[in-house]
Structure formats: C-alpha cells, structure tokens
C-alpha cells in the first residue's frame, strides 16, 4: 500500500542517516544487509503473487481438485524459495513463519502489497538528494500536483 511503502522507505533512510551521523558504520552495514534481505524477500513475494494470479486466472478451466493441487504445488514452491533465501543468508530462523506456517492468498496478497512501492519511494529519496525536507516536499507534491 502507498502509505506503508512510504513509511518503510522513509524509516530505512532515516535510520541510515542517523547511523551515519553517529559514526556507527558497523551497525549501518548490518542494517543495509537487513534491507537487502528484505528486498530479496519482497521480490520472492512479488513473484509468488504473480504466479498465484496465473493459477486463479486459469481456474475456470480446471476442476476443483486440480486447482487445489496447483495451489499446493505453488505453496511448496514458495516455501522452497523462502528456504533458499534462508540458506543464502546463512540463517536458521529467517522467514520461519513463512516456511513453517500457513501460506494463503490473504497473507501473500497483504504482504506483497504492503511492500510493493518501497522501490518507488526509495527512488524518490535518491531524487531528493537524500535530504529529508526535499523528500517530504516531493511526496507532498505527489498528492497535490
């Protein structure tokens, strides 16, 4: 969603500015690694949302048991993607809720929408010269052309 994506992007930039100003470069590097992982997961979510959309687009042509099987295969594929991210990150706990918990349309949809515009707002941050006042002015101008 628009507001959640903006809040996420703005918070990310604010934390990074604060860590730079405090000279906390080790913490900054760790935080930037966290952002990178969040972005990698966001990509997996976006791909999953697209794949699920295709399954439902073709749902009219398939009997209910076939549709159920397609969804189960999709969920297993999504969880495998999450496991692959976790291995890449060398983490034993990352994405635990997604891997071990229930995955359903509502959870996928809400999560992917929540983060979908973060790259857009991050790009606006770059356009603002990485200045909070300029950034907020850019955002205000989006709503009041």
Task: Label each region the model flagged.
Residues 2, 36, 40, 66-69, ...:
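A structural signal for alpha-helical segments
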Residues 3-46:
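Post-HExxH zinc-binding segment in Zn-dependent metallohydrolases
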Residues 45-145:
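Pan-zinc metallopeptidase signature
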Residues 1-10, 106, 110-113:
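Active-site metal-coordination segments of metallo-dependent hydrolases
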